[in-house]
Amino acid sequence: MGRAGILRHRRLNRKWLAFNGLVPVPMRGFAAVMSSPLAGKIIVLGVTGSIAAYKAADLISQLRKQGAEVHPVLTKGGAEFITPLTLQTLARQPVAQDLWKEGQGWQPGHVDLADRADLLVVAPATADVIAQFAHGLAPDFLSSLHLVARCPVLMAPAMNGKMWAHPATVANVDTLKTRGVEFIGPDEGMLACGYEGVGRLWPVDGIVAKINSLLGVL
């Protein structure tokens, strides 16, 4: 292949990546992306009202670098900690927020997105959203999507240690686990409230590894 052919191949490769919403990667990294369990997978990422919401930016970046298509869903509480624009820019996808403003299609947006998802990840997951999922409540886009989704669900809790240890939260987590919901964390360390304890969001690298594990067996 001559120089002109190589350049043409590279241009076509970049166009293919852009068309599929992937982060452009060097040619030597293309094979690694395509061999990733995340390549071409659709991941819905729920971001809820925890100080750890800012870590969703890093999570999106890492998932997209491995070839995943990430669709952020931001709750009202989550929007207090990170902006929709940040998530949209990193994911290159619109950010779902309002259950009552889902676009012009005939099918409700949360239903369409749930039907297409390979995995629903909630990171960070607050005590509130864990309770909503456990009791089948559907007050917003994320909780409604959860009731429709038939894909695997992974939750990464982040909250005050006393909230995590409360009998209600413990019972809600146990309920969800019996339904097949996967959990990762929380981690132990200094919390935003000033206490040492269990409640920190699990490291992003660890969440990505867990996602790879879940999607690698589908």
Predicted stretch roles:
Residues 3-5:
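Intrinsic, low-complexity polybasic segments
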Residues 22, 27-154, 161-218:
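A cross-family phosphate/adenosyl-ligand binding-site feature
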